[in-house]
């Protein structure tokens, strides 16, 4: 397969301009996004954006272990060296902050800076409040009621209710430099072009929709995470074939999500394909609000039974795994549902007929989907395959195709928003790496959008009760058991159409000698090296 793109020549010029004339090591990375994610501290473009302009330029207080490949990571200290819940009031969490850390602009990381950043995204009366950053992270911090400085190296966060899962929320809270914000004239647009965090990379060049140049922060506080390359150039390339051809042409050195049917060609050209178990699910989030056809559980189950998931995996050339629920059966949160998700065309047709529809008298609906982007895999080909699959059972789907960030905005607004009139499913694929992200955000009735991202308005009091019980226990094994019970109920209710789990594939040129593919949607870009 040889596909030529005139765009590649222009890209080569812009990428080349970002490369130094010295002997510095430079790796050019083709990422599956239409633009560089927001660089001010809270990236946009979904969870995938965090690995590019989040955990590179900035740090969270609580971090995720991303530099291992043979097991799932765990929570580890970031800008907080420890965190603990108060013995007498379990709604209060104290975070001990790391000393001696500096922002890229040379200013000190302090408790005041942390409080300033909380205000930046949660306090719309604060002068530094940034609506754009707030939109990215507010729903990821649903438990935060208040926060306060205790002393120069300690802050306290009070949650709305007892929530043993709260530390997982802090993975998403990144810390920008207050001093740099002042220096650029209190303007977040100017800050985006010259940002300052505490992370392992510094942003040294940004050309929107073309590239972001990240330079190694040799003074980074975590010596184990000092980048293995001097410069990392991120190049947005939303189309899989564009990325693949750029890699084959030597215009980039690694890419995410190569075109699946080009894998044999990539391998024969000396490229290395790496992937791993990934907590991620490609799905349709169905509206169960009044007026939606998906209030009928028979139709929800029919969609799940109409899919030949092995064929979807084949479409991905093996770079995916069939999904039989929200999480993989290997997950501690996988329950024991009575509804068994499989390919059963006869049963799917039967359920559709019972609901009053057929191929001769089809149900018609509209789904909103992305034209591509990190996590969406082969968005259009997979959606078109499923469209045909559903047509076989008497369900005709039209697609409203939008850019990924538009889809995320729609996701946060929820199915009840007036902008979603006539749309009854959302196709955001997402991370399922922890109980918050696997279950709570999507199925707790108190997280119905726009409060959270329970897009479709799903409500089950039994699920809510299990989530509440899990939040109130600090015994990890008991938490797992309760979340698995909730998972069972959710799969039986089928508020989503679960299709496949991604394996997060990357293709590396022979130049790239080092890269740790973590069992996570986040990848640690400091592990990329040429020696």
Task: Report residues per predicted region.
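Long beta-strand-rich cores associated with HINT superfamily self-processing modules
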Residues: 506-531
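Surface-exposed binding/hinge segments that line
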Residues: 4, 96, 115, 134-181, ...
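Append "and occasionally in soluble cytosolic enzymes with long acidic Gly/Pro-rich linkers
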Residues: 213-218, 267, 295-392, 398, ...
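Ligand-site clamp/hinge motif
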Residues: 189-192, 219-265
